[in-house]
Amino acid sequence: MVSHRAARRKRASATDLYRTCKQSGTCPPDVVDKVEGTTLADKILQWTSLGIFLGGLGIGTGTGTGGRTGYIPLGGRPNTVVDVSPARPPVVIEPVGPSEPSIVQLVEDSSVITSGTPVPTFTGTSGFEITSSSTTTPAVLDITPSSGSVQITSTSYTNPAFTDPSLIEVPQTGETSGNIFVSTPTSGTHGYEEIPMEVFATHGTGTEPISSTPTPGISRVAGPRLYSRAHQQVRVSNFDFVTHPSSFVTFDNPAFEPVDTTLTYEAADIAPDPDFLDIVRLHRPALTSRKGTVRFSRLGKKATMVTRRGTQIGAQVHYYHDISSIAPAESIELQPLVHAEPSDASDALFDIYADVDNNTYLDTAFNNTRDSGTTYNTGSLPSVASSASTKYANTTIPFSTSWNMPVNTGPDIALPSTTPQLPLVPSGPIDTTYAITIQGSNYYLLPLLYFFLKKRKRIPYFFSDGYVAV
């Protein structure tokens, strides 16, 4: 019987093994050295390359590539043509010493060029002849102006390199004619033309913003948020917290201590006040009004815990001291100037309330009665008023008596009188019988007030002379 041997399974490549086993740390040493290039051969090449330059030869432990130019066949080296570019001549640099001038001439010096005209030659050996004479006639100059025209030309140039910028000269004008040069005068009275200035494209009221994004009119600054849940509220009853806040944190007593700035301290194990333990910073004070008091507040930060890095961790505490209370506003009770007295009970007996649709009926009736010219001698007759109730309001209208009486609206208010009144004493027994006297002429009933449109009540309400019918 022939035994079959199991086929040997091929091992994975070093690169595949390195990818899978590097993260777990179970790679064989030969795989790690081969992939990372730390084998003995690689180390020998690294040490040798420190003294011998082997660059470009392709020597290594990896796959051979033949270097930069590749492998050369054994038959021989192929012919190569090398292109040689023409060499540029070097530029000669001439150094300039410190004593030599630094002015470089743009045009080189050239020789004298002759125009071809012959140069005159002087003959003779006697030299120059000098003649002297004497004249006794004085020299007289004729200053009479000639009859011809005089032409004067003037040209002015302005060179900014030689002109003082602080001096301003008036520009001059020149002429090349027969007239004498006249410059612009700088003093005296001159004639000028007054041209009024005009404004173009005017629109608006002049209060429009001059920028595309105007600044808002009111900008409010948010106050400190001292009453949030992140701040611990601590009340300080000692008034020294306003003037000397450091006396609550440290035992030092400085000569000068600013009270309107932020104060910084070092964390101490013991504080004069237990509420200020571990305080490292007290912010600047703030004055607020809360619940009717003026409150002085400071926000403090504690350094309860300090990490190794130096970070300070602690709570924020709001210390406050109530300086004074704000008095409530005074409330002044207003008193009525006129006291309305209740009307007499007898006036209520003569009030008649009627439901009408229009006040025109009443106005027509009373105007006709008031315009009558009949007068009566009645002595002291009472003035009876009637209140007519409409759909919209109640109107009080006084009835007309025997004389002409104007119609007044509104309630009657009896003003207080200072005249003393004697008490009324009855002269005899009270009689329950009443005598009603109707005084007037013939009368007639108005049909407009006798019959109503909505409520047909055939009841006469009053007579034409203004007295109540009984």
From Swiss-Prot:
GO biological process terms held by the UniProt record: microtubule-dependent intracellular transport of viral material towards nucleus; symbiont entry into host cell; viral penetration into host nucleus
Post-translational modification: Highly phosphorylated.
A GO CC term attached to the entry: viral capsid
Keyword NADP among UniProt keywords: no
Superkingdom, natural source: Viruses
Record's subcellular location: Virion; Host nucleus; Host early endosome; Host Golgi apparatus
Family: Belongs to the papillomaviridae L2 protein family.
Record protein name field: Minor capsid protein L2
Organism from which the protein derives: Human papillomavirus 39
UniProt lineage: Viruses, Monodnaviria, Shotokuvirae, Cossaviricota, Papovaviricetes
